[in-house]
Every structure is written in C-alpha cells, then in structure tokens.
Amino acid sequence: MNTDTTLFILEDCRANLLIVEDEKTLQALYPYWDQLPHLKKIIKWGQPINDLLYSGNVINWTDVMTLGMEFEDNRPMLERHKNIAINQCCSLIYTSGTTGNPKGKIILFRSINI
C-alpha cells in the first residue's frame, strides 16, 4: 500500500494507534504525524527505537508488552469486555479502492460471535 492510501485510511478512520512492522515504514509515515490529529502513538515492531528522534510519539512493541504485564493485576480490560454490545464495531476493514479512495467496512461483534 502506498503512503497516500495509508494516510487516507488513517485519517478516514481517525486512527489513534498505528502499528508498523519496521523502521522503513516508520520513517515513511512519521513525517506526516502532524497531519494525523487523532494519532496518539505509533508502535514499532522489532528492534528498539531511538525515542529522541520521535519525541515520545513512538514506542517499541516490547514496551507495550511490559505495560501489559503491569496491567495484568489491575485487569482494566476485563471491565471493558463486560460492556461490549454485539452491535458495536469490532473491526474496520478497507477495500482496495480500485475505483477511488478505499472504503471502510464495519465488522460488528455479532458478525464474529462464536
């Protein structure tokens, strides 16, 4: 997916979190940080990042895992899980956009309820 398409999707869905797989992708997208007002953090998979380059806006996946371990005792997600309704959005999937901009398709929890 090219940068323009990625930026369109991030703005269209008002993404507040982005996970990138490598430094190349991070370096391609980070210059657009100021154009994505909803984006709060970028999580980078793999090697640790140089936080000084990214002003605290990017964290490494291992840091996310550490935060998860700290939350394990508090169980904040358990309470959120109890409040999920079957008609709420579970996932947002975008089409390829062959005839224009990609279009988002909402997948509800009831669609994947097993």
Question: Model features per residue range: what roles?
Answer:
Residues R14, T99-N101:
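Active-site-proximal glycine-rich helix-loop-beta segment
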Residues I86, K105-I114:
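Conserved structural elements of the adenylate-forming
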Residues V58-T62, T66-Y94, N101:
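Conserved pre-ATP/AMP-binding loop-to-beta segment of ANL
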Residues T95-S96, L108:
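Conserved phosphate-coupling serine/threonine residues in phosphotransfer and NTP-handling enzymes
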Residues M1-L67:
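Structural core segment of the AMP-binding/adenylate-forming
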Residues T3, L26, N74-M77, N113:
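Short, well-ordered alpha-helical scaffold segments within catalytic/effector domains
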Residues K40, K103-K105:
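Extracytoplasmic/periplasmic beta-strand context in beta-sandwich domains
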